[in-house]
Design a protein with these regions (language model features):
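Oxyanion-binding "anion nests"
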Residues: 199-244
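Conserved small/polar residues in nucleotide/adenosyl-binding loops
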Residues: 248
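Active-site bordering "gate/hinge" segments
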Residues: 2-213
Length: 248
């Protein structure tokens, strides 16, 4: 069992290691640091950025289970980092990401990720820390009498929608700034009921590769690697984005 998280999530990591070890698992773990990562990115040359992560590659090639938590001390830690540096670093992560996706797809690797409440994420959500804790734990239904039974109930309800959507071939989404058609004929809908992402409550599929046409506008900002973009609009033709716009 591989356990990974930012160092701010150490209490979660500690408890997971304890319970997994008691259950008989052989545990490996990795605690990351935003400060250390910043220095690594800032002072690496192109070859070093693309070198990859030997720890992740080695572990994910062999692990049976990967448990991870999201949460850091600073949601904007890499906002001012050059986008090209981040791009080259992502290229270096391709090998371990391939191990992850291939082994997840084959069933060799089981994964589950969850949110760990942090002060920075509470601030991002415009909540006090205690409010954010209640929000996260409430989303996981951890305070109901029988969380497992409740997630099984949600799974059954979502499965009803999965069976309904499996009979559909096209989805047409229309709203303010959005008019897009998605071909899902022959695609399999997946019931996400807490076994991978936790908490969950999602039903998803993928479109036919050349079967998306129209435009979509996002009313909320897109945030990636600490960079925030407002007013995103994508224009899609035959499954490819042919134009993108943003306000900031």
């Amino acid at each position: 069992v591989f356990v990974s998280a930012d160092e701010v999530c150490t209490p979660w990591v500690t408890e997971v290691i304890k319970e997994a070890t008691k259950a008989g698992a052989y545990v490996e773990y990795k605690l990351s640091s935003q400060e250390a990562r910043e220095m690594q990115l800032k002072y690496s040359n192109d070859e070093q950025l693309r070198h990859g992560d030997l720890i992740m590659e080695t572990i994910l090639e062999k692990a049976d289970v990967w448990l991870s938590a999201w949460g850091g001390r600073n949601t904007r830690a890499f906002t001012n980092m050059d986008a090209e540096i981040l791009k080259k670093s992502q290229e270096g992560a391709k090998k371990w990401r391939r191990f992850y996706s291939d082994r997840m797809g084959s069933g060799e690797l089981r994964w589950c990720g969850t949110q760990y409440p942090t002060q920075s994420d509470a601030q991002e959500a415009s909540m006090s820390f205690s409010e954010y804790e209640d929000f996260v734990y409430g989303a996981g239904l951890l305070e109901v009498d029988d969380p497992v039974a409740e997630w099984k109930r949600i799974s059954a309800e979502q499965e009803r929608w999965v069976k309904y959507l499996d009979t559909k071939s096209e989805i047409h989404i229309v709203s303010e700034g959005t008019d897009i058609k998605v071909n899902v004929k022959g695609r399999k809908w997946i019931n996400c009921d807490g076994k991978a992402n936790f908490p969950d409550g999602e039903i998803f599929t993928s479109p036919v590769e050349d079967g998306v046409n129209g435009y979509i506008t996002f009313s909320f900002p897109g945030i990636y690697a600490g960079k925030e973009v407002e007013g995103i609009k994508l224009i899609v033709k035959d499954g490819k984005v042919i134009e993108d716009r943003k306000s900031t």
